[in-house]
Amino acid sequence: SGQSWRPQGRF
């Protein structure tokens, strides 16, 4: 996946 604030995948 990939967040808007953290385009790393998952956090």
Curated annotation (Swiss-Prot):
Mark the residues carrying the PTM Phenylalanine amide.
Answer: 11
Is Isomerase set as a keyword in this record? Answer: no
Q: Which UniProt keywords are given for this protein, alphabetically ordered?
A: Amidation, Hormone, Secreted
Q: What is its main location?
A: secreted
A GO-annotated cellular component:
extracellular region
> Is Transport among the key words of this record?
no
Compartments it resides in:
Secreted
What GO molecular function annotations does the UniProt record carry, in alphabetical order?
hormone activity
Q: Can you say what this protein is called?
A: Cardio-excitatory peptide 1
Give the source species: Lissachatina fulica
- What high-level taxonomic lineage is stated for the organism? Eukaryota, Metazoa, Spiralia, Lophotrochozoa, Mollusca
